[in-house]
Design a protein with these regions (language model features):
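Charge-dense, helix-prone N-terminal extensions
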Residues: 1-96
């Protein structure tokens, strides 16, 4: 699942870079737009400015001031939870 997320994030637009931080892989353009973190039974995709994303598929979790995440339990959920849409939105926000 981590590799699926990496492919989507790096294909979300030009100038995407990745770095290993905080125990996961962080993706940025001019600023961080998402990160992927692997756990024993799931993978989370974190959005630092997730409160600004349009949650048209009702997949975002978290109720903090800014951060939101999507939890993935199987490779099929990458598609069924519309992850590419959320990552593209986050990239567009980071790009400005």
């Amino acid at each position: 699942m981590v590799q699926q997320v990496r492919r989507i994030a790096t294909a979300s637009g030009s100038g995407v870079s990745e770095s290993v931080k905080y125990g996961g892989i962080m993706f940025s353009h001019t600023q961080f737009f998402c990160g992927v973190f692997a756990y024993r039974n799931h993978v989370t995709v974190e959005f630092g400015q997730g409160h600004r994303l349009e949650d048209r598929y009702q997949q975002l979790e978290g109720n903090g001031q800014y951060r939101r995440h999507i939890k993935l339990h199987s490779p099929a959920e990458v598609k069924s939870k519309h992850l590419a849409d959320y990552i593209k939105q986050a990239y567009a926000l980071a790009k400005g």
